[in-house]
Amino acid sequence: MDQFIKQDETGDLIETGMNVANHFLSAPIQGTNSLSKATIIPGVAPVLIGNPEQKNIQYPTASHQGSKSKGRGSGAKPIIVSSSEGGTGGTQIPEPLFAQTGQGGVVTTVYQDPTIQPTGSYRSVELAKIGKERMINRFVEKPRTSTPVTEFKRGAGNGSPRPDNPRGGHRREWSLSWVQGEVRVFEWCNPICSPITAAARFHSCKCGNCPAKCDQCERDYGPP
């Protein structure tokens, strides 16, 4: 009997293992089955089963995000990231992928080469590499003919959240997402006096020198 695992079998084993893990992680945890009361030493049952047996472990919904859990529970806990951009202002873009023309941005799709169809457990990884290469070639800076844009380097300067630009201008921003095997890109313009944020946001000019539109974002608003 051959005891060595072939390369094509490795992907199937990994995929099977991930499917099993996802099955158990997605299944709700029943509190009544989480502990066996018959095996617990008398006297310590209230401590061990007090929290898990009160109710099933529930993941927070959208209305409960940001709330802190009281006490300690068992099992996996969702990671809740507290917002650190509360004071940055601007209007957050709720779902950039479904933005329509006229909202100040444009959605494009980086289609994959139909002749390249990776298979197996690493299919998404290979497709992501292809999408990355196409995005790099897609967003090549072109010579600008009108509104100047200040070059921005994260971490440079005196740490001011707003780069100095007495003439005003716009900064092009992108939100990249991987959706059903395709790379979708939402792009829009923000005034260069606005802060750089991790979330996709529309900002208004604070310095009074930035134009309402530039040569890059004129097409974002559709025909005049």
Swiss-Prot record:
Localization: Virion; Host cytoplasm
* Molecular function GO labels: metal ion binding
Region annotation (Disordered) ranges: 57-98, 144-172
> Where is Zn(2+) 1 annotated to bind?
170, 189, 214, 217
Q: Which annotated residues bind Zn(2+) 2? A: 193, 205, 207, 210
Q: Does the keyword Transferase apply?
A: no
| Primary localization | virion
Q: Which UniProt keywords apply?
A: Host cytoplasm, Host-virus interaction, Inhibition of host innate immune response by virus, Inhibition of host interferon signaling pathway by virus, Inhibition of host MDA5 by virus, Inhibition of host RLR pathway by virus, Interferon antiviral system evasion, Metal-binding, Viral immunoevasion, Virion, Zinc
List, in alphabetical order, the GO biological process terms annotated in this UniProt record: symbiont-mediated suppression of host cytoplasmic pattern recognition receptor signaling pathway via inhibition of MDA-5 activity; symbiont-mediated suppression of host type I interferon-mediated signaling pathway
**Could you name the Gene Ontology cellular component terms for this entry?**
host cell cytoplasm
Establish whether keyword Metal-binding is in the entry: yes
Which family does this protein fall into? Belongs to the paramyxoviruses V protein family.
Q: How does it assemble?
A: Interacts with host IFIH1/MDA5 and DHX58/LGP2. Forms with host DDB1, CUL4A, STAT1, STAT2 and STAT3 the mumps virus V-dependent complex (VDC).
Q: What is its biological role?
A: Plays an essential role in the inhibition of host immune response. Prevents the establishment of cellular antiviral state by blocking interferon-alpha/beta (IFN-alpha/beta) production and signaling pathway. Interacts with host IFIH1/MDA5 and DHX58/LGP2 to inhibit the transduction pathway involved in the activation of IFN-beta promoter, thus protecting the virus against cell antiviral state. Blocks the type I and II interferon signaling pathways by interacting with host STAT1, STAT2 and STAT3, and mediating their ubiquitination and subsequent proteasomal degradation.
Protein name as it appears in the record: Non-structural protein V
Q: What organism does the UniProt record list as the source?
A: Mumps virus genotype N (strain L-Zagreb vaccine)
